[in-house]
């Protein structure tokens, strides 16, 4: 189908001209083919009126755990290690494949409602996440979470699972699914096991998605065990020799950030989750000023407790000003980059998504700015970073397909998903 979005303001995320006050976007199939004045020679099947709206690249949630929506509001006001060991991991051990399927569907619905078109997920039963991704029409990077166990055969099986996931789903669903390798963290995987993970990533020619330096305790224990920080440890054993999505990077030193820059690692900032779990705040402004590609994420819906990337953009842009006593820290456009083009770079997808440009995939969010909280329209970049709400998202296009229009999702029965999640979540806690 050929689409025209007409008379729309455009935040393209192109360096030379990020904002256009009024333009027209032509989409042919899954690709953006023309941006500019109305061209009567281009035939279209559908016209979307963009008057009093702004088109932006689809938001990219670069770190999350979608199936954890079943545990939203289940265990709150608890520090990370207690939260994991006493509350989350015991319940997760009872999860079924169907649980993860329905929980992931719910998370994808929530993301679409709030303008997210691409995610990077680490969980298990990833075939079910892939099926949900295919059905909903969203774009995703899937990583099977790998935690080393005492049984060597189980550990080998986890690597085989990842290889199978890659062979089954990588570049499938019209190219909307990619697969990376997902070791949970350096404190849950030994050096020798991580080296096996790296070899698998090299074999598959893909990246690694891992938690890094999320808490002070993790860093302290790394120094006790290895005599170095988690970042230095991961570099020394070769993890950063492949493209790495490093979730959190909260407690990182100047030496660590130099390593992240040198090895072209992409940290993912999860400010709300890090704040809620009292983990701290990553030195994002300093990393950005060093030229490090920092992406943005929500973390899981059980530790955030939502998947609203507009909240993350707003928080990322504001809290860093307070932390640094610097009103210029993480300006509005930089926060928006973290949620779009930086996320695309982190996920090795920036040649296709992350900005609205001719030749790129049509992952576009149309936001209604004809609302009281948007007026007056002095600066639309500031408005998107500091003012926009998830409920302002009107239309979502992914891979050239209209997934949501007038806030109605077209690909999945939302009521059915909510019903099944409520039923399964209550049952899960009682198992």
From Swiss-Prot:
It is an enzyme of class 3 (hydrolase). Zn(2+) binds at residues 63, 65, 211, 299. It holds the Pfam family Amidohydro_1. Its EC number is 3.5.4.28, 3.5.4.31. Its cofactor is Zn(2+). Keywords: Hydrolase, Metal-binding, Zinc. Belongs to the metallo-dependent hydrolases superfamily. MTA/SAH deaminase family. This is 5-methylthioadenosine/S-adenosylhomocysteine deaminase. It comes from Thermoanaerobacter pseudethanolicus (strain ATCC 33223 / 39E).
């Amino acid at each position: 189908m050929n689409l025209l979005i007409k008379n729309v303001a455009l935040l393209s995320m192109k360096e030379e001209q990020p904002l256009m006050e009024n333009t027209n976007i032509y989409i042919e199939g899954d690709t953006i083919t023309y941006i500019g004045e109305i061209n009567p020679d281009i035939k279209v099947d559908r016209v979307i009126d963009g008057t009093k709206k702004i088109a932006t690249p689809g938001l990219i949630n670069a770190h999350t755990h979608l199936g954890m929506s079943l545990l939203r509001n289940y265990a709150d006001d608890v520090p990370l290690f207690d939260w994991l060991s006493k509350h989350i991991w015991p319940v997760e051990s009872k999860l079924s494949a169907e649980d993860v399927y329905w929980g992931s569907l719910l998370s994808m619905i929530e993301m679409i409602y709030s303008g997210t078109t691409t995610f990077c997920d680490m969980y298990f039963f990833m075939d079910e996440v892939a099926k949900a991704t295919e059905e909903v029409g969203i774009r995703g990077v899937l990583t099977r979470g790998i935690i080393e166990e005492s049984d060597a055969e189980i550990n080998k099986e986890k690597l085989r699972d990842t290889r199978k996931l890659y062979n089954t789903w990588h570049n499938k669903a019209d190219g909307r699914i990619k697969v990376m390798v997902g070791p949970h963290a350096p404190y849950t995987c030994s050096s020798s096991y991580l080296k096996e993970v790296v070899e698998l990533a090299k074999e598959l020619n893909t990246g690694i998605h891992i938690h890094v330096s999320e808490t002070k305790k993790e860093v302290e224990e790394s120094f006790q065990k290895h005599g170095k920080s988690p970042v230095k440890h991961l570099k020394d054993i070769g993890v950063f020799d492949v493209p790495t999505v490093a979730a959190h990077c909260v407690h990182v030193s100047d030496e660590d950030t130099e390593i992240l820059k040198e090895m072209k690692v992409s940290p993912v900032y999860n400010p709300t989750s890090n704040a809620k779990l009292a983990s701290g705040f990553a030195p994002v402004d300093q990393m950005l000023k060093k030229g490090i590609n920092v992406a943005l994420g929500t973390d899981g819906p059980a530790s955030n407790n939502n998947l609203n990337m507009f909240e993350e953009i707003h928080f990322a842009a504001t809290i860093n000003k307070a932390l640094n006593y610097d009103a210029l820290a993480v300006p509005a456009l930089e926060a928006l980059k973290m949620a779009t083009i930086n996320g695309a770079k982190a996920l090795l997808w920036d040649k296709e998504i992350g900005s609205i440009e001719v030749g790129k995939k049509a992952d576009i969010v149309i936001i209604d700015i004809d609302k009281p909280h948007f007026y007056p329209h002095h600066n639309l970049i500031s408005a998107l970073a500091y003012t926009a709400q998830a409920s302002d998202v009107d239309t979502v296009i992914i891979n050239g397909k209209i997934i949501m229009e007038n806030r109605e999702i077209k690909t999945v029965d939302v009521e059915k998903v909510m019903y099944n999640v409520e039923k399964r979540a209550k049952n899960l806690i009682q198992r």
